[in-house]
Every structure is written in structure tokens, then in C-alpha cells.
Amino acid sequence: MKKIKKKKIQKIVVIGGGTGTFTVLTALRNYSVPLHLTAIVTMADSGGSTGRLRDQYGVLPPGDIRRALVALSDASQTLRKLFNYRFETCDLKDHSFGNIFLTALEKMTGNFGCAVKEAARVLNINGEVIPVTLDNINLCAELADGSIIRGETNIDIPKHDPSVQIKKVWLEPVARLNPEAKKAILAADKAGYRAIVVDS
């Protein structure tokens, strides 16, 4: 009797955030080879619903994490759609349910990492979603004319003259790498994982 060779699970780490990471994770889930996916998500988003929640509640940015969780979710279509549902009127206008859910979990647990793990359990994700840092950071840029821009959204959607080139970028404060993200990256390198860096 011929022995059936079991396919080796390919382990892939995706580093990025926003729509780009969601698209890559969604595509990889449809890949014919068995995969274990780990998303290491950027934490500098400051626009839209995420920016408002950061300003009002002092939480870490939930939006990019939410997208990665939904991309890896094995929950029902209704639950996945619920997490992406965006309110259209009144005080909650433009907020997504998933962003509010993650904000509430962070306030309850006092730890964004714990909030992400609990949301991952609720959404029954197939893989891992890890914030790259647990520090409350902002992306900053110095322009060629010497002016300083703070906040990712102010860089992406400039209020300044967009023809002025960016001279350098940095994080404020200097971010500490989440130990779980470091562990995943080192394990990936050791095991010969494939790492994909997504420009979000």
C-alpha cells in the first residue's frame, strides 16, 4: 500500500497594515498549499475612526488589527461582516463595530495585546495577529522646508504642499518591539518561514 505523504505546512509572516495586509492575507488563505499565517501589524494609524478612538479614549489603534483579524477569521460571514460594519449617522458615524469592540476590550483588560487575543478567539481566527508594538506611537516626518508633520493621516492626506519632499521619518516616542512580534520574526527566520512586507 502506497503511503500518502502529508503536505508540510508552509509558515508565512506578513508584516504591514491597512488594506494591503488585508488583501494579502485574504489571497493567501485561498492558496492551495496548507499555510500557517502570522500577521504582524503596524500601530501608527491615526486617521478616521481609529484616530478618533485614539484621541477620545487613549487606546492603541484598532483599525489595521481589525482588518487582519477579519481576514484570518473562520467565523460566520455574519460575524465577519459585523466587525467591518460601519455606522452611518450620529455620534458613531464612520466608526466600525470592530474598532469599538477592540477599544472596549482594551479598556476592560487594560492591555491591547490581551484585547487582540480575545477578539481573535471570538472571531475564531486561523493564524495569529500580533501588534508590532504595544507603545502609543505616532509617525512623524520632516519636510525639505524644515516643517514637521505628526500623525500618519497628516502624512498620507497632506494639509501641506504635497510637492514638498519628505526629508526623514521617525516614530514618537521611540517604539519598543512587542516581544511576541520579535519571537514570531525570529522563529520565522530560524524555521525558514517566508516573510512578506506589505506597504500599506
What are the residue ranges of the model-derived segments?
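Short glycine/serine/threonine-biased micro-segments
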Residues: V14-G16, S96
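Short secondary-structure boundary segments
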Residues: M1-K6, R80-N84
